[in-house]
Amino acid sequence: MTGMTTDADLRELTVGTGAGGEQLGTDMVLNIGPQHPSTHGVLRLRLVLDGERVVSAEPVVGYMHRGAEKLFEVRDYRQIIVLANRHDWLSAFANELGVVLAVERLLGMEVPERATWLRMALAELNRVLNHLMFLGSYPLEIGAITPMFYAFRERETLQTALEEVSGGRIHYMFNRVGGLKEEVPAGWTGRARAAIGEVRRSLPDLDNLIRRNEIFLARTVGVGVLSAAQAAAYGASGPVARASGLDLDLRRDEPYLAYDQLDVPVVTRTAGDCHSRFEVLLDQVYVSLDLAEQCLDRVDRLTGPINTRLPKVLKAPEGHTYAWTENPLGINGYYLVSRGEKTPWRLKLRTASYANVQALATLLPGCLVPDLVAILGSMFFVVGDIDK
């Protein structure tokens, strides 16, 4: 050894930087997911961090893509209902409903009035079940365990009612083109009304536990603020958009089924932060319980069939139509194109979760890493609904 420095000694070699290597040396690139306990499915977030502050965020979707839209093209109009309720497993009844509404619109079919009101009652109960899941899981994600038990207690009460009428706990498959699968069991509306009353009496336990909890407020108030302009730009809808001040609800503004015969209160907030999104979801539960009860009252006063007799092979006429519904997580759209065959030529889904999750690219930059999961959970999405 001579102690002399050669050109070879001065050469620098960077090994294994992978994706995002250009930021190494100043910022850190961090991947959240695709497997992560705070997501309903497999979502990946590619983050660039400066210390504990997020500089940029990119939601990477597609890990749960199962080709639902392509599968629709090789299933007849009865079989697609089986697929329709699986991309958002927390809103199964609402997803079935959107598909059959599109088919019925293309067929020019009038659905029996009793079936219409039963659909509305079941859709509102399904909305409550969806919201209760997030009302329990969201506090859990930021460290509050107890609300989960209260939320699941109320879910089980309503889940029993829906299981009795449809036979399914998650995938109901109760909608049919032209109505519903079958008549509800004798006395079911009374039992469903009793379940609604029980949930309404018990819900304040969850409400009082978490809404004004000091620690919960500290973690959510002023965190992850999404302005009304940003929500509109991303096409956000549902509780996420209404928490930012977008007063939009299809049940009131573009009514389908018989929602035009109901007074539908629309729950909104203006702060656009995590706490506002949680409050909108919580207050919507009270509204949906009231709406479901009104629908059941109407069902009890109606007689007549629950569905429409269909031909053995159902073919929609050539043409196209678009139906949209106010799903629990936001606006879902169904664009149906038919060539006069027994299967759809194309059925395009517009899902609320896909639009809402895009806002993370705006929400996350500037936040601290500890707030990241609080913001992520408050967007209330299902990854199957994103990836389809």
Swiss-Prot record:
NDH-1 shuttles electrons from NADH, via FMN and iron-sulfur (Fe-S) centers, to quinones in the respiratory chain. The immediate electron acceptor for the enzyme in this species is believed to be a menaquinone. Couples the redox reaction to proton translocation (for every two electrons transferred, four hydrogen ions are translocated across the cytoplasmic membrane), and thus conserves the redox energy in a proton gradient. Its main location: membrane. It is a peripheral membrane protein. InterPro entries: NADH_Q_OxRdtase_suD, NADH_UbQ_OxRdtase_49kDa_CS, NDH1_su_D/H, NiFe-Hase_large. Gene3D superfamilies: Cytochrome-c3 Hydrogenase, chain B. Coiled coil: none annotated. The keyword Membrane applies. Keywords: Cell membrane, Membrane, NAD, Quinone, Translocase, Transport. The keyword Ribonucleoprotein does not apply. One of its GO terms (cellular component) is plasma membrane. It catalyses: a quinone + NADH + 5 H(+)(in) = a quinol + NAD(+) + 4 H(+)(out). One of its GO terms (molecular function) is NADH:ubiquinone reductase (non-electrogenic) activity. Belongs to the complex I 49 kDa subunit family. Transmembrane segments: none annotated. It is found in: Cell membrane. This is NADH-quinone oxidoreductase subunit D 2. It comes from Salinispora tropica (strain ATCC BAA-916 / DSM 44818 / JCM 13857 / NBRC 105044 / CNB-440). NDH-1 is composed of 14 different subunits. Subunits NuoB, C, D, E, F, and G constitute the peripheral sector of the complex. Its EC number is 7.1.1.-.
